[in-house]
Amino acid sequence: MLSRVVLSAAATAASSLKNAAFIGPGVIQATRIFHTGQPSLAPVPPLPEYGGKVRFGLIPEEFFQLLYPKTGVTGPYVLGTGLILYFLSKEIYVITSETVSGAALAVLVIYAVKKYGAVIGQFADKLSEEKIARLEEFKQSCIRYAEDGIDFEKEKQAVVQKRHYLFDVQRNNIAMAFEVAYRERLHTVYREVKNRLDYHISVQNMMRRKEQEHMINWLEKKVVQSISAQQEKETIAKCIEDLKLLAKKAQAQPVM
Amino acid sequence: MNEELSTFFYVPVGTMMLAIAFPAILLPTPNRLITNRWITIQQWLIQLIMKQLLSIHNTKGLSWSLMLITLTLFIGLTNLLGLLPYSFAPTTQLTVNLSMAIPLWTGTVVPGFRYKTKISLAHLLPQGTPMFLIPMIIIIETISLLIRPVTLAVRLTANITAGHSLIHLTGTATLTLSSIHSMTITVTFVTVILLTILELAVALIQAYVFALLISLYLHENA
């Protein structure tokens, strides 16, 4: 298990060393080369879905595959058992208090991994999923914001296309207002002119009437002056005689 | 390895350098946003611990956050790795712990005295002490202040070393009893298991406590 870590660490170290600067000894300052490698790690290769397969939690599957052609399925197990027994019997590995503490630790670790391993793995996955969900939500909200902006812009553009209706209406309104004002003023002019002409006519009429009255009064005055006293008496006697004649005629005919 | 555990001042340089450098392999640096389970859980644990540790500091104090995180991780990981059989925990050596504690403590106290002398000196006298006790209190508080790095180092050393010694001794007892009376080794083996659980807890707790105390000293002295 740790062998894979070491191998991958060595691989990344080797590749980074390949890209890193190479400073040869005894080279003058001006020819030093720095930062020749690619400065970016993108695109990062995807994480593998599952870790490498191991047996007993320690020994990678590749070891078993390595020994399979020569020794079959039981080969690695026999090798392991033999090694352990060899080390124990020859006291190459001495059983000390460390063995006991190692055994206790092994018991604890195996128990913890068996019981809580999957739970912790799921918890870690949940953390990653929450992170991805937060980022996804942010991305979606940015996209929604941009789309809302686009819709808003389109709407405003459509409104702008229909602006000419508004202008036509306003233009018609203004034309009507002009028309009304023009007619009003025309009417005012007509009225004023008519007033003036009526004034002149009424002045003329009044003058003529005054002249007539004056003439009539003058005539009457003169006629009345011209009637002498003698004429007046004769006229009155004639009138009385006419009235008597009429009274006789009236008596002769019965009143209806 | 057994001799190294039972002496405080013997300094094994070669294995110690290896033991100090090894935990770095267990803390990989992610080069992507969504990482594998190992790194995700590490990030989550670090966030959990550091939220507690760093919540009390102002902006200036937060410049210590990397130091505190590194401290917690280093002490925790070296303690845990020291529980493995045939491994070595550098935190059992007083030299390592002193060389961590003294600079860190000095770094919290000396700037405090330099820039905020009044506040730092005021910490030496708790509020509401009666007048006649003041000289005694000042002396006692000064001594307690000056002894803090030693307490930090010795606490860590003693805890880890004591745990290792207990496990070692109980293991030896198990081995010795196995030839005398085989049935009692179940008792001692269970004791070893329980001690290992305790040691696991102690390893992590001591790391946290170390960093917490440094954070508190930092907070006291601004």
From Swiss-Prot, chain B:
Q: What CDD domains is this protein classified in?
A: ATP-synt_Fo_a_6 (cd00310)
Q: Which reaction does it catalyse?
A: H(+)(in) = H(+)(out)
In the record, biological process GO terms are: proton motive force-driven ATP synthesis; proton motive force-driven mitochondrial ATP synthesis; proton transmembrane transport
InterPro entries with a match to the protein in the record: ATP_synth_F0_asu (IPR000568), ATP_synth_F0_asu_AS (IPR023011), ATP_synth_F0_asu_bact/mt (IPR045083), F0_ATP_A_sf (IPR035908)
Intracellular or extracellular location(s): Mitochondrion inner membrane
Which residue windows are transmembrane per the record?
8-28, 64-84, 93-113, 127-147, 160-180, 197-219
Which Gene3D superfamilies does this one have? ATP synthase, F0 complex, subunit A
Q: Which UniProt keywords apply?
A: ATP synthesis, CF(0), Hydrogen ion transport, Ion transport, Membrane, Mitochondrion, Mitochondrion inner membrane, Transmembrane, Transmembrane helix, Transport
Q: What is its main location?
A: mitochondrion
Specify the protein's topology with respect to the membrane.
Multi-pass membrane protein
What is said about its interaction partners and assembly?
Component of the ATP synthase complex composed at least of ATP5F1A/subunit alpha, ATP5F1B/subunit beta, ATP5MC1/subunit c (homooctomer), MT-ATP6/subunit a, MT-ATP8/subunit 8, ATP5ME/subunit e, ATP5MF/subunit f, ATP5MG/subunit g, ATP5MK/subunit k, ATP5MJ/subunit j, ATP5F1C/subunit gamma, ATP5F1D/subunit delta, ATP5F1E/subunit epsilon, ATP5PF/subunit F6, ATP5PB/subunit b, ATP5PD/subunit d, ATP5PO/subunit OSCP.
Protein name as it appears in the record: ATP synthase F(0) complex subunit a
Q: Which organism is it from?
A: Loxodonta africana
Q: Could you read off the lineage of the organism from its UniProt record?
A: Eukaryota, Metazoa, Chordata, Craniata, Vertebrata
Q: What gene name is listed for this protein?
A: MT-ATP6
